[in-house]
């Protein structure tokens, strides 16, 4: 067994961690924004095709980076993502068959079309079924109509019941020959034909 003095000597031989560790001046904000921008670019099939054409998917470090980026699927990070398809494509990029298939332009077009059809049809149809609809209001039973003697209405009561005219109704009462459409000669410009 080693004496305590010998153990003290061994402890001094262990290198201490460097004192000049790098500290991010903005607390990781720039890295966060760069990763957010990159992951949202993955929502574009043309960009994935570009990465495949330039053989990024053959680099093991890049594949590891794509695996690392899966932390964006956690709830505390997903709230920052504006294009949720990027997470779907990130999941697909974990499959090597998908990575190699995206190098072909026809597969890029297929992915782009499927994405478009999802936005056009599925999402809207799905929302129709998800959003709550108000229940139809029950129609109250109408009381039986009692025979009554018809008296002519008083003129003041009729005037009080007539609704006020809206501005659109006032415009209909104006004549079609509005002075704004008249030229200096008094001819309606809307009705004038060329060549006369």
Curated annotation (Swiss-Prot):
<feature type="region of interest" description="Disordered">
    <location>
        <begin position="133"/>
        <end position="196"/>
    </location>
</feature>
<dbReference type="InterPro" id="IPR008831">
    <property type="entry name" value="Mediator_Med31"/>
</dbReference>
<keyword id="KW-0805">Transcription regulation</keyword>
<dbReference type="GO" id="GO:0016592">
    <property type="term" value="C:mediator complex"/>
</dbReference>
<comment type="subunit">
    <text>Component of the Mediator complex.</text>
</comment>
<keyword id="KW-0010">Activator</keyword>
<dbReference type="Pfam" id="PF05669">
    <property type="entry name" value="Med31"/>
</dbReference>
<dbReference type="GO" id="GO:0003712">
    <property type="term" value="F:transcription coregulator activity"/>
</dbReference>
<dbReference type="InterPro" id="IPR038089">
    <property type="entry name" value="Med31_sf"/>
</dbReference>
<feature type="compositionally biased region" description="Acidic residues">
    <location>
        <begin position="1"/>
        <end position="12"/>
    </location>
</feature>
<feature type="region of interest" description="Disordered">
    <location>
        <begin position="1"/>
        <end position="24"/>
    </location>
</feature>
<keyword id="KW-0804">Transcription</keyword>
<feature type="compositionally biased region" description="Low complexity">
    <location>
        <begin position="156"/>
        <end position="167"/>
    </location>
</feature>
<feature type="compositionally biased region" description="Polar residues">
    <location>
        <begin position="168"/>
        <end position="182"/>
    </location>
</feature>
<comment type="function">
    <text>Component of the Mediator complex, a coactivator involved in the regulated transcription of nearly all RNA polymerase II-dependent genes. Mediator functions as a bridge to convey information from gene-specific regulatory proteins to the basal RNA polymerase II transcription machinery. Mediator is recruited to promoters by direct interactions with regulatory proteins and serves as a scaffold for the assembly of a functional preinitiation complex with RNA polymerase II and the general transcription factors.</text>
</comment>
<keyword id="KW-0539">Nucleus</keyword>
<feature type="compositionally biased region" description="Pro residues">
    <location>
        <begin position="133"/>
        <end position="155"/>
    </location>
</feature>
<comment type="similarity">
    <text>Belongs to the Mediator complex subunit 31 family.</text>
</comment>
<protein>
    <recommendedName>
        <fullName>Mediator of RNA polymerase II transcription subunit 31</fullName>
    </recommendedName>
</protein>
<dbReference type="GO" id="GO:0006355">
    <property type="term" value="P:regulation of DNA-templated transcription"/>
</dbReference>
């Amino acid at each position: 067994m080693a004496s305590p003095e010998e153990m003290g000597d061994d402890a001094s031989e262990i290198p201490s961690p460097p004192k000049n560790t790098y500290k991010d001046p903005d607390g990781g904000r720039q890295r966060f924004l760069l990763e957010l921008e990159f992951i949202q670019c993955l929502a574009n099939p043309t960009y994935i095709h570009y990465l495949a054409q330039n053989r990024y998917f053959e680099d093991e470090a890049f594949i590891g980076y794509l695996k690392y980026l899966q932390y964006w699927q956690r709830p505390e990070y997903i709230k920052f993502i504006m294009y949720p398809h990027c997470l779907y494509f990130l999941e697909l990029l974990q499959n090597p068959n998908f990575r190699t298939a995206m190098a072909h332009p026809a597969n890029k077009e297929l992915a782009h079309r499927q994405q478009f059809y999802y936005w056009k049809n599925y999402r809207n149809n799905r929302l129709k079924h998800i959003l709550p609809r108000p229940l139809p209001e029950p129609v109250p039973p109408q009381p039986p109509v009692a025979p009554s003697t018809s008296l002519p209405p008083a003129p003041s009561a009729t005037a009080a019941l007539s609704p006020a005219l809206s501005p659109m109704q006032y415009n209909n009462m104006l004549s079609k020959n509005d002075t704004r459409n008249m030229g200096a000669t008094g001819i309606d410009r809307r009705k004038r034909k060329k060549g006369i």
